[in-house]
C-alpha cells in the first residue's frame, strides 16, 4: 500500500510503502477487535471496589429481640444483610478484573485495527513530529491545515518533548510512541497519523513478534 507523505506544514514529502500484511487486510475481524478492547479495559480497572460483609460490620452481635413472644420473625445479629446498616450480601470485593488473551490474538487485533483505518482512508503519514518550541497555537493551525481534528499520532521510537507539550492541550489529540500503539486508542480516534519513523517501527514490532513466535 502506497501513501503520500506530508510535512506538518502541509507540503508534499514523497511517498511511502506500507506492508499489506499489517495495513492491507481486507476482511476486518470485528470480534477480534472487541475481545482485545475488552481485555485492555479490564486490565485498566483498579478493582478497588469493596463492600463490607456481615462479618466485617462493626455492630454488636447481641441477639436483637427475644426468641419468642414478639409476634415477629426470629432474629439474631443486626449484622445480617436484611437490616439497615448490616453487611452486604454478595457485594463487590477487591479483585483484579484482568483476564488472559493470547499474544497471537493481540497481534492479529493490532493488524486489523491498523488495516481498518487504512481501509476507511483514515490514516495519514507525515515526515516527522518535531517542533522547535512547544507552541500549541502553531500546532493547532498546522492540524487545521492538514484536516486533523480527532487523531492518534504515533511519533516514532521517542516522542519529541516540544511536540508532546504542544499537543497535550489540544482536545481529541493523543500522542504515543510506537511502543504504546494499541487497539483501543487506534479505534477511539477518527484518524491515525504516523510518521515515517513510526511506520518502520510498527513493521519492526510485528517482525519481532513473528520472530518470537517462531
Curated annotation (Swiss-Prot):
The keyword Glycoprotein does not apply. Keywords: Ribonucleoprotein, Ribosomal protein, RNA-binding, rRNA-binding. One of its GO terms (cellular component) is ribonucleoprotein complex. The keyword Metal-binding does not apply. GO terms for biological process: translation. Residues 43-83 are annotated as: Disordered. GO terms for molecular function: rRNA binding; structural constituent of ribosome. One of the primary rRNA binding proteins, this protein initially binds near the 5'-end of the 23S rRNA. It is important during the early stages of 50S assembly. It makes multiple contacts with different domains of the 23S rRNA in the assembled 50S subunit and ribosome. Belongs to the universal ribosomal protein uL4 family. Part of the 50S ribosomal subunit. NCBIfam families: rplD_bact. This is Large ribosomal subunit protein uL4. It comes from Hyphomonas neptunium (strain ATCC 15444). The lineage of its organism: Bacteria, Pseudomonadati, Pseudomonadota, Alphaproteobacteria, Hyphomonadales. The gene is rplD.
Amino acid at each position: 500500500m502506497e501513501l503520500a507523505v506530508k510535512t506538518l506544514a502541509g507540503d508534499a514529502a514523497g511517498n511511502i510503502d506500507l506492508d499489506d500484511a499489517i495495513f492491507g487486510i481486507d476482511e476486518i475481524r470485528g470480534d477480534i477487535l472487541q475481545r482485545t478492547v475488552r481485555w485492555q479495559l479490564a486490565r485498566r480497572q483498579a478493582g478497588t471496589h469493596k463492600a463490607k460483609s456481615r462479618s466485617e460490620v462493626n455492630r454488636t452481635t447481641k441477639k436483637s429481640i427475644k426468641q419468642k413472644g414478639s409476634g415477629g420473625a426470629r432474629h439474631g445479629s443486626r449484622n445480617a444483610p436484611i437490616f439497615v446498616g448490616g453487611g452486604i450480601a454478595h457485594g463487590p470485593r477487591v479483585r483484579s478484573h484482568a483476564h488472559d488473551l493470547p499474544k497471537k490474538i493481540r497481534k492479529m487485533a493490532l493488524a486489523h485495527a491498523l488495516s481498518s483505518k487504512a481501509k476507511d482512508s483514515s490514516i495519514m503519514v507525515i515526515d516527522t513530529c518535531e517542533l522547535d518550541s512547544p507552541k500549541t497555537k502553531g500546532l493547532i493551525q498546522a492540524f487545521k491545515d492538514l484536516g486533523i481534528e480527532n487523531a492518534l499520532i504515533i511519533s516514532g521510537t521517542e516522542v519529541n518533548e516540544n511536540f508532546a507539550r504542544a499537543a497535550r492541550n489540544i482536545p481529541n489529540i493523543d500522542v504515543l510512541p510506537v511502543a504504546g500503539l494499541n487497539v483501543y486508542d487506534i479505534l477511539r480516534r477518527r484518524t491515525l497519523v504516523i510518521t515515517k519513523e513510526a511506520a518502520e517501527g510498527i513493521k519492526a514490532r510485528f517482525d519481532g513478534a513473528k520472530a518470537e513466535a517462531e
